[in-house]
Regions:
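Histidine/cysteine-enriched polar flanking segments
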Residues: 1-307
């Protein structure tokens, strides 16, 4: 259509993979880094970096992104994820202050802090996945759903087929040593990217917001979300379409939703939580993976920019 086009690139001699998906290509807001201006932001792509081997974006696509130079790409480490897309751990939201945006990062550490707070408040038996099951099947002779095992199925779809979720509580999560170890590993992966993003986008800690998140490792040792990943949201100006996390419910309210609202709404953002378990989360995606947002073009013309 008018003012809208596309480019088709495909490799001749190598197979494509999930890292070639456009969930693995993001663009930062405009930034200034060490005196250099990036008026159209910088391209972010996920890779196997810093590992010498692993999945990478196919050569022709990667080379195409690097060749345009105006939005000089930043390569991040995303191969630790089962799908491998960087939008599973980082996104940006607009603000009306001088910075004009915040970077959001998925944070297992923030989730564990929140759960420990609730446990100390006497809410350790608050249930997760309220109205959703957490196992492929039910225990023989019982109507209860099982908590996901330490290295269970890769697909979260297998975790939501039951009906009774009373066994998945804050106490249960906090007592799962294997899950804790896995999330310590995930946090280290995210922290590696945090340092890269701070350096390459000129960010300070005050420019970053940590959203509570939990992950599990699949049988290949790759991470998948333990509950719907709120970072993989749709950003529509001040309105955020956030995957409903189905976190522990205490006092009739999900503590994850409450914490996310407390972090984002003071910035003038409106949080709307959308259920996407059946439609996207069960296939290792979230609502953002099945939507396409048409952005308003920058007033600044890219051809006026000197790389």
């Amino acid at each position: 259509g008018p003012d809208f086009g596309y480019v088709h690139k495909e490799p001749l001699f190598e197979a494509t993979a999930s890292l070639d998906s456009f969930g693995n290509v993001e663009v930062s807001p405009p930034v200034s880094v060490a005196g250099k201006e990036y008026p159209l932001g910088r391209i972010l792509i996920g890779s196997s970096f810093p590992a010498p081997a692993g999945r990478r974006m196919t050569g022709p696509v990667r080379d195409f992104l690097y060749a345009q130079r105006v939005q000089a790409p930043v390569e991040l480490y995303s191969d630790w994820l089962a799908v491998g897309n960087l939008n599973e751990f980082v996104t940006f939201v607009p603000t009306s202050d001088k910075k004009q945006f915040r970077m959001l990062l998925a944070s297992p550490a923030a989730c564990y802090r929140l759960f420990r707070e609730k446990q100390k408040e006497g809410q350790g038996e608050a249930t997760m996945f309220k109205g959703k099951g957490t196992a492929r099947g039910r225990s023989r002779g019982q109507g209860e759903a099982r908590e996901p095992g330490p290295r269970g199925d890769a697909s979260p779809a297998a975790w939501y087929s039951g009906t009774d979720t009373k066994r998945v509580t804050i106490n249960k999560v906090l007592s799962n040593d294997v899950l804790a170890q896995q999330n310590q590993y995930v946090q280290r992966c995210i922290d590696w990217n945090r340092d890269i993003l701070k350096k390459e986008l000129g960010l300070l800690e005050e420019d970053i917001i940590d959203l509570p998140a939990l992950f599990k490792l699949d049988k290949q040792g790759k991470a998948v979300p333990y509950f719907p990943n709120t970072v993989t949201m749709i950003v529509l100006a001040k309105d955020l379409g956030i995957p409903k996390p189905f976190g522990p419910v205490a006092g009739g309210e999900c503590c994850l939703e409450r914490r996310i609202r407390a972090l984002l709404e003071p910035l003038g953002l409106c949080c709307r939580f959308l259920e996407d378990v059946a439609s996207y989360h069960g296939s290792l995606g979230e609502v953002r993976c099945g939507t396409s947002v048409q952005r308003r073009p920058f007033a600044f013309k890219w051809w006026h920019c000197t790389p």
